[in-house]
């Protein structure tokens, strides 16, 4: 989501009526402004080795020295403020479950090079090219918790919050 944000355009905001200063430049009131997520996420001002996929950059602060000065607040894939994405919490929960299932059950191998991804067309959203991945089933099963507590009550009873993890992920 950092290297290839879902939205390719900037998410607009309007400056206050009295105007304001943005990054050292005066902007008159009522002006539509925006920051490209792609530019912010690829900027060395915000992230060390910004063009590289390095998941260790997200480890808790202090664990990876080379990323200690990263501006993590610049990473806002769902926008920010009162008009941010309504589906943000659902998308994060869904992504965690899907990735957990994939990583527990498969060893993955990327089959295409990065060149195709660098040449993607963009309009308002990305015209994505396929990402070809080969999955190898794992021989050993990881021990999973028996139950998963969901943070919502679907039908008014607390019992409905408990779901078998195997059922949820199958």
UniProtKB/Swiss-Prot annotation:
GO terms for molecular function: heme binding; iron ion binding; monooxygenase activity; oxidoreductase activity, acting on paired donors, with incorporation or reduction of molecular oxygen. InterPro entries: Cyt_P450 (IPR001128), Cyt_P450_CS (IPR017972), Cyt_P450_E_grp-I (IPR002401), Cyt_P450_sf (IPR036396), Cytochrome_P450_monoxygenase (IPR050121). Heme binds at residue 85. The keyword Ribosomal protein does not apply. PROSITE patterns: CYTOCHROME_P450 (PS00086). Pathway: Secondary metabolite biosynthesis. Its EC number is 1.-.-.-. Its cofactor is heme. It is an enzyme of class 1 (oxidoreductase). This is Cytochrome P450 monooxygenase oryQ. It comes from Aspergillus oryzae (strain ATCC 42149 / RIB 40) (Yellow koji mold). The lineage of its organism: Eukaryota, Fungi, Dikarya, Ascomycota, Pezizomycotina. The gene is oryQ.
